[in-house]
Amino acid sequence: LASCRSRDQDVSADSRPQVLTTFTVLADLARNVAGDRLQVASIVKPGAEIHGYQPTPSDIERASKADLIVENGLGLELWAQRFTAAAGDVPTITLSEGMKPLLITEDAYSGKPNPHAWMSPQRTMGYVDHLERAFSQLDPAGAEDFAANASAYKAKLQALDQELRKAIAALPAQQRLLVSCEGAFSYLAADYGLEEAYLWPVNAESEITPKRMARLIDTVREREVPAVFCESTVSDKAQREVAAAAGARFGGTFYVDSLSPPDGPAPTLLELQRHNVGLIRKGLDLSESNR
């Protein structure tokens, strides 16, 4: 109890403006731009599913005390509008604002934006620009710091972009079909020349049908895809069944909608991207997997 009180006192004694993001990936971006001038926290904890998250009363209380709320937009946080309305008049920024999104092309979500734009390092730079502007309005005295932090982080994103491009370019052309549970890799695929196939387009784990599974099994078998993957925030049971039926391997767990805990393989967005592309290389490159 004493330690809990101590933590509460530390938070209340911290006079820095409070920034609350909807999920962990955005919190990581915000911390990189904010440096030590702002407090940054995420509503959704590492490992939690973001699409259908239901905010708790304590989440809403935290939001009402924040100075700024940061969301992704593009329909990712289905609960965000109710959440921000319940939080009162706290300013909210949408990091995808002004972006031309890729569109989902099938099922009930056809024509709607794919929300996973942070999976493209190039597009993530736009997120960083939004954060820099919002933080400079929130804390004008820190504007130079925010600009410097944003510039340094965008340089890391640019280097990451080249790193990922080189890694995926090394895959043989016939081995560039990425099979995941959710269609969360459209931006990565578009940037680096991958094809994608998946069990559901977005936010639709409950919509897996025998027909959809059979179609994916046929695709994996016909294209001789060596490995399939799934994301950390959903069950991989169906995808493992696809792998077994098609004669492929289950290639591992991607991180997309959530970072890992600090001691996991993807505690930051940069490490998340490297982890995922490492799995892609290992799973799809037959020469790599046979070493």
Where are the language model's segments positioned?
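Extracytoplasmic metal-acquisition and chelation regions
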Residues: 4-291
